[in-house]
Amino acid sequence: MAQTLYDKLWNTHVVHTEEDGTTLLYIDRQLLHEVTSPQAFEGLKIAQRPVWRISANLAVSDHNVPTTDRSHGIADPVSKLQVDTLDSNCDAFGITQFKMNDVRQGIVHIIGPEQGATLPGMTIVCGDSHTSTHGAFGALAHGIGTSEVEHVLATQTLLQKKSKNMLVKVEGALPRGCTAKDIVLAIIGKIGTAGGTGYAIEFGGSTIRALTMEGRMTVCNMAIEAGARAGMVAVDDTTIDYLKGRPFVPTGAEWDQAVEYWRQFKSDDGAQFDRVVELNAAEIVPQVTWGTSPEMVTSIDGRVPDPEREKDPVKRDAMERALAYMALEPNTPIESIKVDKIFIGSCTNARIEDIRAAAYVVKKLNRRVASNVRLAMVVPGSGLVKAQAEREGLDKVFTDAGFEWREPGCSMCLAMNADRLEPGERCASTSNRNFEGRQGAGGRTHLVSPAMAAAAAIEGHFVDIRQLG
């Protein structure tokens, strides 16, 4: 019987299934960070349980670490306590960790793939919503709660119920100026933030196959924003080429065996999906969110929608509330919206490809950050991304134009560290969530691609990067 990619990943990890469908799944890799792991480790200590499989875990501090000078440590006492607690827990249990001043430190969903800890055919969990990122490698990856983090530490298993299968198929050549971020925002705009609820989404089609691994990770990262349990892409040569030679990846004869095994993780011809959604890549244009949900998105050449035209009263109320929070009027041209801050970073868009794309726009425009922009910051996703960008001279491109070049971390994606918006500030952000207060109480977030964010920094408002040439 033909199987989908999700079917194969699920079936190869079933330990036991109850009559009601509840399944005990084996977990190959758990990624840990400082926010959702303290209670899990404390539970182990209280119960006097060991970590079942130490080598299956990898830890890093990312949410609370400063992105400015780290020589003075962490100023906020709560943030410092969380980071110190992860350090001590990993030391006590023997878990591999990249500490704050390790060059390998970075955002958990960036360091996993770049180290080769994320591999095809794996089940991967982390106490973080955007664990779906790792599905780009033909893996089943999703976020879990703190009690589940403890359960995986203790047993290397997890109780789950199988999701339905969805295929999102994107065909055709992506137009100039459009990126993986625009693809996934367009998908969410089409199906909504509840469109994937109850499903695991496989992203396929010629457009997805043409993406780099960085681009595929961006798409899978935001599967959760479409309501899906997980997002994934089939294994191909692009996957294999990315992984070869990375630190955690098998070598020699074991590499050859692994590659042969990994290549099975794709949907069989004739595999049946419960839902299929199709997009034409030629119709995708640079995207900008206007509201307080990723589904509140439109094209750069569009306008802020008018709630009066929405027939659904629930959606109309949500639109009205969003516009009030965002301080926007219906029918406002997107290109006329001015911004106060720029954030280029996050687990969605802080890889070397993203940094290069933003730097290209800055060089192309050849001007400094606009006078109305109070802060434009670039936060690499890891120490290794930062080092690579500096070798290429990209840091100087940004700093010469008036951007701040920071240390790696989650930064302004969420208001959990020193990088945040003040009430009323408007930000062009390459992150994944534009909820009320996400980047700081009263802050207003517009989600865009790195190239779009860079252009907004220079112009002081949103612009259509397709016109840059």
UniProtKB/Swiss-Prot annotation:
SUPFAM superfamilies the record matches: Aconitase iron-sulfur domain
EC number(s) on file: 4.2.1.33
GO biological process: L-leucine biosynthetic process
Binding site for [4Fe-4S] cluster: C347, C410, C413
Cofactor note: Binds 1 [4Fe-4S] cluster per subunit.
Enzyme class: lyase
Keyword set, alphabetical order: 4Fe-4S, Amino-acid biosynthesis, Branched-chain amino acid biosynthesis, Iron, Iron-sulfur, Leucine biosynthesis, Lyase, Metal-binding
Electron transport listed as a keyword: no
Required cofactor(s): [4Fe-4S] cluster
Pathway: Amino-acid biosynthesis; L-leucine biosynthesis; L-leucine from 3-methyl-2-oxobutanoate: step 2/4
Database matches in PROSITE patterns: ACONITASE_1, ACONITASE_2
Pfam family, one: Aconitase
CDD domains xref list: IPMI
GO molecular function: 3-isopropylmalate dehydratase activity; 4 iron, 4 sulfur cluster binding; metal ion binding
Superkingdom: Bacteria
Catalytic activity: (2R,3S)-3-isopropylmalate = (2S)-2-isopropylmalate
Keyword hit for Protein biosynthesis: no
Oligomer and partners: Heterodimer of LeuC and LeuD.
PANTHER family the record matches: 3-ISOPROPYLMALATE DEHYDRATASE, HOMOACONITASE, MITOCHONDRIAL-RELATED
Recorded family membership: Belongs to the aconitase/IPM isomerase family. LeuC type 1 subfamily.
Function: Catalyzes the isomerization between 2-isopropylmalate and 3-isopropylmalate, via the formation of 2-isopropylmaleate.
Protein name: 3-isopropylmalate dehydratase large subunit
Taxonomic lineage from the root: Bacteria, Pseudomonadati, Pseudomonadota, Betaproteobacteria, Burkholderiales
